[in-house]
Amino acid sequence: MKKIITLLFAAIAIMSCNKTSQKKQTAEILRDKPWQEISPSEIELNPLQMIDRDWLEVSAGKEGKMNLMTISWGSIGELWNKPIFTVYVSTSRYTHQFMEENDYFTVTHFPASMKDKLAYLGRVSGRDEDKVAGAGLTVEFTELGNPIYAEADLAIECRKIYAQQFDACLLPPEQRAWYEQTGNGIHYMYIGEILHVWKK
């Protein structure tokens, strides 16, 4: 009986190590894999899956002064005959000031093995610590100087073409109550024209 229990624990330990190894391997493979530029219409991921379930990182700023945060609100589509990506950032978030100060932002998608890293990036503020280092990400910069990440499998670079804060007076009662109860700053909507899309 003791031998069976010992073997069982050993099997569990091996499975755990294998899962950790697979996660590491996925990140390492993507880190070394070159980006391939595609058109916005060639994005294959389901938007609802990509935004609401997988989560994304929105980043703004330049080398030496940038920030990123995890988002699960957003949309992709067409406006004024331009392909667009829309993100929503609360005024209480550190990323908000970077979105205001910069003309561009990027949206990046990561493999499922990185979900715990995205949870960390959504939980911790860049005011308090170096989130990029904490998540073990490798920052790369586009020709326009905007941050994307070597461990991501999709990167979307946008030029900000419209920004406006939600009008509290026009919010549905339940949403207005949510802002009042949580103390979260009312979100800004940022619409970005998609300039470049890269995948791995």
How should each PLM-predicted stretch be described?
Residues 1-2, 186:
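Structural motif marking the loop-to-transmembrane transition
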Residues 2-8:
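Sec-dependent signal peptide recognition
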Residues 14-16:
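C-terminal motif of bacterial Sec signal peptides marking the signal peptidase cleavage site
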Residues 19-200:
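Active-site-proximal mixed secondary-structure blocks
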